Amino acid sequence: MLIVLCSSCKESTEDEKAMQQMVERLFPEYASQFSFEQSEKIDKDWYEIEAQGGTVRIRGNNANSMAVGLNYYLNHYCLTSVSWYVNDTVEMPEVLPMPPAKIISTARCKNRFFLNYCTFGYTMPWWTWKDWERLIDWMALNGINMPLAITGQESVWYRVWTKLGLTDEEIRNYFTGPAHLPWHRMSNLDYWQGPLPKEWLDTQEALQKQIVARERQFNMRPILPAFAGHVPSELKRIYPEAKISRMSSWGGFEDKYRSHFLDPLDPLFATIQKEFLEEQTKLFGTDHIYGAI
């Protein structure tokens, strides 16, 4: 007699796996007491929390929604919170409290933006993947789904400026040092405390690949940079007819640190934009949302 046993257990979705991995990172000793279930998608993000057989079951339309549900449970039933600092522990009760009734919530807004250019110039230039991993967990727990993602863009620019004829020395001198890159990226300042080491460019490129991959795992659409007109002054050597203007001094810095802008009506502008977006997409993919300043 041949007996075939069929399991009713379905394979976890990628969103469910992402959530299980999150709890294993944050409080591994409790991971088996949580279950996650991705359910049908509707027009709005939503989550549902309920007790089920001694475990906390969290349902939602995607990982981001389930993460928000987890955060609600932690805040209101465990009376704890998760910080974005990687070395902070999450203080959990000895016994997980079970919700007495089902909780259902729906997101009030579709797009939830986070971060700004300056944020990337405080301690972030020195962050490792572990620091970013914790911040992305925190972002998911708080429902962020449109994070600014500008790490590693200098590696893209290095490729673009090289393709347009600038030398390695010209390109790396054009960038500021790591702590001042936000103000370089905002077109305020060039050259200050440069050049950037090529090794640093490569490290940040690898880090950005990890960042955007994890953000997308939690249903986020990273906002990547685009070209706004800021160019190295040395570009004039290769394109002497280009309409490049020197900007006024900024923040009390000497004239030699002033930035330069290409006229958006100059045909070279579209060429640079196309090259940048193509190179960036090769490295980091795209969700077709960009920020330029």
Model feature map: region roles:
Residues 76-77:
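Aromatic-residue-lined binding/catalytic grooves and analogous aromatic/hydrophobic interfacial grooves
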Residues 23-42, 94:
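Auxiliary, metal-adjacent structural segments of Zn-dependent hydrolase domains
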Residues 80-99:
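The feature marks proteins involved in alpha-glucan
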Residues 15-23:
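Short Lys/Arg-enriched alpha/beta "domain-start" segment
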Residues 38-43, 48, 52-64, 68, ...:
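Aromatic-lined carbohydrate-binding surfaces of glycoside hydrolases
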Residues 5-14:
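Bacterial Sec-dependent signal peptides at the C-terminal "C-region" and cleavage site
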